[in-house]
Amino acid sequence: MSQDQEEDYSKLPLESRIVHKVWKVRLSAYEECSKSFSLSADGSDNCFELWNNQSELWKSVLTDSNVAAQEAGTAAFVAYCRFSDPSHLLKAREISVLSISEKCLTSPRAGTRENALEALMLLVEADSAAPVIESIIPSLSARSPKVIASNVAAIASLVEQFGAKVIPSKMIIPHISNLFGHADKNVRKEASRLTVNIYRWTGDPLKDLLFKDLRPVQTKELESLFAELPTEPPKQTRFLKSQQPTSEPNVETQVEEQPALENEESEPEPSDDQFDLVEEVDVLPNVDPNLETLMASSKWKDRKEALDKLLPVLSQPKIKDNDFFNLVAILTKSVSKDANIMVVINAAHCIQAMAKGLRSNFSKYASTSINALLERSKEKKANVIESLSSAMDAVLATSSLDDLAELIASFAGNKNPQIKSSCFSLFSRSFSNMTSLPSKFTVDTCAKACVPGVSDTFEPVRSAAAEALGVLMKLVGERAINQYLSPLDDIRKSKIRSFYETATVKAKAPTKKSKVKPSKQEESKVVVPSNAKAVKKSVVPSSPVVPSPRKATNKSLSMDVSKGNAFENGPLLPRPTTRPVSRGLSRGTSSSLQQKVKASTPLNSGALNETVQNLKNMELDDPAPQPAKHSRVDRYEHPKVLEDNDSTISSLESLKRENEELREQLKVEHEENISMQKQLSELKGELNTLRSARKASPIGDRKPAFMRRANTDFLELSTSPSFQRSVREFEPTRPKLYSSIDVNQRSPLASAKTNGNFTFHAELPRSPFSSRANNINPDWTKAIDLAAKLKQKITEMKQTDQRHQGLIH
């Protein structure tokens, strides 16, 4: 094997593999990038980070010397153009267009040429066509006729797809005459095709600009081509992103815009209005107090009759919220464990009635109810499955799928195929009935739960899982689900797509608030009436308006509504005054001048009364209510709201810090647990080593030899005369005879001779070689120490687990 085959290049960084000298390594890197781009959730995914920061890498990719690697590189660039953020795509546009026009469009491989043309069209879709055409035009004067012909063909395809309104024909027409004068026939052929495509969009004005520079033969040929064109006007088949209509709602993008008037006219559902108007009914006192006893009866008829009486009590349009935990526990137990299907059906109907009557107040019982209903969905009878499904839909309507997604997804791996099928069917119905888009976590949980079901051995499970994925794809978009479908084959993907095409969903993208809710300036604007004398008052702003000092009025200084004035910030209230004062009677004037003014222009009391009366009439004629009190209330409540917001933000920040500290503690405890496990395994290994050494110890082999030697010594001692005299002397007082007087030197066998035979007593003496064993095998002390350490480590691990549980809860 060669050195290249022996080395594992997959461990190298992606950036190193992209510029590697081995073309197979570059090929695998390009294919990996293409796959990661197509499976990305959005344009901000981590797979785009390298290319966004180093867009010059595309030059080496698109101009790869190996044709196979170049084809994979162009496919990766097409995926990048299709799935990346357009703002980052514009950075690589100039480099990529030059590389495509010089190397990719002239490639001997058809796949490379198709990818290059698709990349140019995607670059045009991202922003505009002018920068792309501007980068291609220098290639029209290249030395190689093949390069010129391929670039002219690319421009002709762009004009055919986007039209002359998007593709700037003024940049192209001046170069067409030079193309018709080229020596290569392929260049002239592509130039004719380009001219025909432009003529379809521009019409006869093209003749005035072009025919004066062409030969008569070329003009005649073009006239014949123009005559063969269809009479109907051409249609644009590809659009810029700014021209593309809003498609299906997506999780991250695509906000549906609606006018403000349209939003104001939309009315809520009639059922919600009727539910608000219905009076609440307290059903708990009407429940039979012996219900629990009746449901524990061994006769199924008693249980069924109890539920038959309970169902009308719970079938109320609106139920008053109360403590229903005991009742829900009784019903869920009947659903999950009762052997009679009639009792199960009635219990499911009772749960459904409670969910419809309590609505959002039933959400605290939703997880318990869904768990019991899904567990019982193993039944095969249609009436049972229908009752359970209706109850599950009613329960799910009281809560949100974001809260129950993990619980429902846990049943996707159940061994019973009926339960798995019911789980996927519940997902499909919930996706279809959702009125708002789910969170990313919910989408991820549901998709990962449904994908294995598509490959299940049971056909109804496969069909239900494919339907759930198809409806979810319709709800959140293809791109958000494609990343989960990569392990599936084409047959299963086509089945999911068939459900996707026929699925219907209720969820819509959220509307922009700026078009529905008026701004503060719009709220504070006053409506200017037709009668200039009557001043209308508008909504008082939240902030107080400080009146400016009064200035002298003049007829020439008329109020201009277009300019900023007091009406834009609040109502212009009249300022009461004791008497009208002329400009000359201000402070600082001399007393003589004031006397002259008084003498020349005496005050008219009638004019003063008339002015005061006019001011009163202005207030009386005003139909709008005086909002001064409301403005004061708003003024004093506003700081409270700010204070509450600040306290809420500070509490959230403190909770965030506590959460981070708990995470750090969990991390440290986890590391300690790992180290303790390693030490525990080492101690176990040492203990096993000591046990094996004990088995191979020489003491086990020496023990029989000691026994034989001790017995031999005993026999020699028993036959001696001194031993026999001792027996006769001490036999009345000591019936038991030992072979040794010293306790530490006794024989392992205590015996006595009777009729020439030895009899053994039940009380055995201590082994004479026990102390020798301790001296010979000291490893047992080490084993005891290791066992103590092992016990201590196990205790510490248990304490660590208890701390983990406490931190989690």
UniProtKB/Swiss-Prot annotation:
UniProt cross-references to Pfam families, sorted A to Z: XMAP215_CLASP_TOG (PF21041)
Location within or outside the cell: Cytoplasm, Cytoskeleton, Microtubule organizing center, Spindle pole body; Chromosome, Centromere, Kinetochore
Gene, per the UniProt record: alp14
Composition skew (Polar residues), residue ranges: 239-253, 597-608
Disulfide bonds: none
The protein, known as: Spindle pole body component alp14
Acidic residues bias (residue ranges): 262-274
Residue spans of the HEAT repeats: 127-164, 167-204
Coiled-coil spans in chain: 637-697
Claim: Coiled coil is one of the keywords in the record: yes
Region ranges (Disordered): 233-274, 507-608, 619-638
Family statement: Belongs to the TOG/XMAP215 family.
Biased composition (Low complexity): 526-551, 582-595
Description of how the protein assembles with itself and partners: Interacts with alp14.
GO CC terms in record: cytoplasmic microtubule; cytoplasmic microtubule plus-end; cytosol; kinetochore; meiotic spindle; microtubule cytoskeleton; mitotic spindle; mitotic spindle microtubule
Chain's role: Required for bipolar spindle formation and proper chromosome segregation. Has a role in connecting the kinetochores and the plus end of pole to chromosome microtubules. Also required for the activation of the spindle checkpoint pathway.
Main location: cytoplasm
InterPro entries: ARM-like (IPR011989), ARM-type_fold (IPR016024), TOG (IPR034085), XMAP215 (IPR045110), XMAP215_CLASP_TOG (IPR048491)
GO biological process: attachment of mitotic spindle microtubules to kinetochore; cell division; cytoplasmic microtubule organization; establishment or maintenance of microtubule cytoskeleton polarity; meiotic centromere clustering; microtubule nucleation by spindle pole body; microtubule polymerization; mitotic spindle assembly
Gene3D superfamilies in UniProt: Leucine-rich Repeat Variant
Record PTM Phosphoserine, positions in chain: 543, 548, 697, 720
SUPFAM superfamilies: ARM repeat
Basic residues bias spans: 509-518
Domain of life: Eukaryota
Record keywords, A-Z: Cell cycle, Cell division, Centromere, Chromosome, Coiled coil, Cytoplasm, Cytoskeleton, Kinetochore, Microtubule, Mitosis, Phosphoprotein, Repeat
Single GO MF descriptor: microtubule binding
Record organism: Schizosaccharomyces pombe (strain 972 / ATCC 24843)
